[in-house]
Amino acid sequence: MPSRAASPALSENEFDITGALFQNDSDSDAETQKPTKRKKVPAAPNVNLDFLGEANAGDSDEDDEAFIAEKQTSANRKSANLKGRTVKKGGGFQAMGLNANLLKAIARKGFSVPTPIQRKTIPVIMEDQDVVGMARTGSGKTAAFVIPMIEKLKSHSTKFGARGLILSPSRELALQTLKVVKELGKGTDLKSVLLVGGDSLEEQFGMMAGNPDIVIATPGRFLHLKVEMNLDLSSIKYVVFDEADRLFEMGFAAQLTEILHGLPSTRQTLLFSATLPKSLVEFARAGLQDPTLVRLDTESKISPDLQNAFFSVKSAEKEGALLYILNEVIKMPTGPTEASLRLKEKGPEDSKNKKRKRAEMERAVNMKESPTKHSTIVFAATKHHVDYLYSLLREAGFAVSYVYGSLDQTARKIQVQNFRTGISNILVVTDVAARGIDIPILANVINYDFPSQPKIFVHRVGRTARAGRKGWSYSLVRDADAPYLLDLQLFLGRKLVLGRESDQVNFAEDVAVGSLPRDGLSQTCEWVSRVLDDDADIFAQRAVSTKGEKLYLRTRNAASAESAKRAKQVVTSDNWTAVHPLFQDEASNLEAEREKMLARIGGYRPQETIFEVQNRRGGKGGKASEPDEALDSIKRVRSTLEAKKKQRAQAEELEATTNTDGAEVDGDAFSDLEGDNANIPDNMSLASESDLEVTFSSYNTTDKASKSNSNSKSDSTPTTLFQNPEYFMSYTPANTSLAEDRAYGVHSGTNANFASATRNATMDLQADEGGKGFGEPRTLMRWDKRHKKYVSRQNDEDGSKGTKLVRGESGAKIAATFRSGRFDAWKKGKRVGRLPRVGEAETPGLAADLGGSGGSFGGKRFRHKSEKAPKAADPLRGDYEKMKKKAEAARERAASKVGGVTSGGKSEIRNTDDIRKARKLKQKRREKNARPSRKK
């Protein structure tokens, strides 16, 4: 038999497919080989060709999946980071190893270049590392964790069990996340469900039975379903805690701990937050495995385009100062805004069209991307201040929106949307409320209440002067806030300019402090006083805000001791009350002298008491009186105080001379430390061990001490220096300010140690009365009649009274109502025997049979529309009369139907509006068809 001709196509063993795999990869070394002549190879009988089976007999399927995923990622990547090659500058999503379908979805959504948080987090997440990301809402953090999730999950799994879990603090944020997942998941068959409070539990039972891939939920409802359905979470590979600081603030810590206990240890956990409270750091240490902290350096620095102005005011002038800044400095217009006028001008037909209305709102948002000179955000201390300022500014005629932590979610969304679309120009918020809001680029930021930490100041003013645009921040500083201002000045490392000490002031590089013009400020203060006298509601709101401020000041962080000492000198100086350099052109020399005179009168303190004045004038009746005992006691106290002042002054002079002599003797020994520690405040001894550990991690104290010791070798140093250079470690660093490190640590270089990285990034915001227990007595008791004793009233408020709380699997207390038996009743009603276990094959069409939405949110549901004749009432039943009346009413309704339309239905007679509308539709059809009328 003649031999068979060789096949023109090469076999799998002779054809190299690497060229086809990497044909678009410019960095691949593989090249397409030319076809070679086929050689005849004699067959080897009884040869076992299963080499892979013998070599990899012990390997698992997970290793194969990891190998395939790695190869596919390298094939998708346009430019690999190989030796001698670097990724292109400004590389987009193509350089991250994403598949083609996901890249198309990203381009369809309008993402061309990744945001900074996306550029930093996505490569780390793709390497299966746990990540703690600090980013505000609006920075693209939602896509930063959704894109890697879709890339990792790829397609729907036929094995039962969810693989992705996203926990959000509110229903609105969960809906927003679901929308992003749906848009980026186009082209895949991934199923996603939304589990939030307020929806039907039975429908959510059907959703979970439909084997979703991604679960987007709030912690309370997801824990309820977990306990009720006895869910097995061992299949989850990807967990995201979105707005984690908000989750802890709303009291979801117990729910998160219980959920975290049921997750597998092999999961990948991501945690995104706007700030990093201490409680969140502890949670991350316990729930994440060697996490990586991702924090943008740009969010920890003040923009160089930001100009700052600090105004010294008195407590009674704060409202007037705020109005003066809005009216005279920002030139804020009063009355309705242009956006609100445009909405009023629209006809009723346009307002009824939802699609057109939504398009107009989106167009308004896009127009708001470039800041106007009137968009302003005002930061207040508590929610009571927010309510008070909102009412006061509304009374002044401004268009205002307000947001605080405990505000209803729907109202919060409406208020923020009004500000974004330009319906209002001013947004009054608290630090807690503004932390995660997607606020557009602003032109002005006003600190009505000065922040207690430099971090919070940076967090506030970081919303303006973005993308190369100019911005202003105005801060009202009282005498009690001066220490915090000096702490901020030390942290920023800028020059402090009081009043008109310098003719040339750079508001972007200096901390310029001064007062507002007295004439304009007095007018606004008089207007505020008149409003408070006329409006009882605003007066009551001010009283409540004053009480809330007292509680806020009790919990506020204390300023440094050195700044408190300097603040006394700064506040008592004449330049503290001088006119701010911002108003230098407006005030003439005569006005400046007038301001100085008013400042002297305002700061006048009498040297004599009323008793001394009366005695000098001859008593109350104008005649000389005998020496009074009160007057004698006052004189004795005054003489004692004057003697103490003299002693203190002499002691200070003696100490100064002693220090001068010591500096001359040991000048060489302390010359090195003196220059380095010139700006170190005195409260450095209060630094904790963690702060010292962070500081000393990049500083070699032994070398520094040995260097100072070598420079100070003399005969007199052994009696002066007490430290042993071999063992002594100084508590102050020689090259950096520890106060700056404590205030805000900008990470640089390696970030391998999460604990040390989070110490500098931790920031706790003061509550704005939104937190439970703020301003309330800690122990509220009530009398328990049954047990004859006092018990805590907190049990009645959080549901822990009696047996309403049970311990979950992790030991945390959860509500006992989570296990109510509704899932068993639902299974019985749906005639479901047993749902598939995790890892088993899913049942096709199970979700549709159970009445779910097929694994998606917002699916169509069956509705009963058929009408049947009512059954006749049974005389033997107890509700015979009731059923008889129902049957008669149903027969009357059926008898009233004429021609299929009820008596209450729409009339078929056309009115003038119907005829006019029909003519318009007919004319539109004629124009659309573009056909001439038929000739008769």
UniProtKB/Swiss-Prot annotation:
Alphabetical list of CDD domains matching this protein: DEADc_DDX54, SF2_C_DEAD
Pfam family of the protein (one): Helicase_C
InterPro entries, A to Z: DBP10_C, DDX54/DBP10_DEAD-box_helicase, DEAD/DEAH_box_helicase_dom, DEAD_box_RNA_helicase, Helicase_ATP-bd, Helicase_C-like, P-loop_NTPase, RNA-helicase_DEAD-box_CS
Cellular-component GO terms for this entry: nucleolus
Motif residue range(s): Q motif: 91-119
Biased composition (Basic and acidic residues): 341-352, 867-895, 907-916
Subcellular location: Nucleus, Nucleolus
Feature: compositional bias, Low complexity: 701-717, 896-906
Reaction equation(s) it catalyzes: ATP + H2O = ADP + phosphate + H(+)
Transmembrane regions listed in the UniProt entry: none
Molecular-function GO term, any one: RNA helicase activity
Start and end residues of each Helicase ATP-binding domain: 122-294
GO biological process: rRNA processing
Domain of life: Eukaryota
EC number assigned by the record: 3.6.4.13
Entries under PANTHER family matching the protein: ATP-DEPENDENT RNA HELICASE RHLE-RELATED (PTHR47959), RNA HELICASE (PTHR47959:SF8)
Family label: Belongs to the DEAD box helicase family. DDX54/DBP10 subfamily.
Protein name: ATP-dependent RNA helicase dbp10
Source species: Emericella nidulans (strain FGSC A4 / ATCC 38163 / CBS 112.46 / NRRL 194 / M139) (Aspergillus nidulans)
Top-level taxonomy: Eukaryota, Fungi, Dikarya, Ascomycota, Pezizomycotina
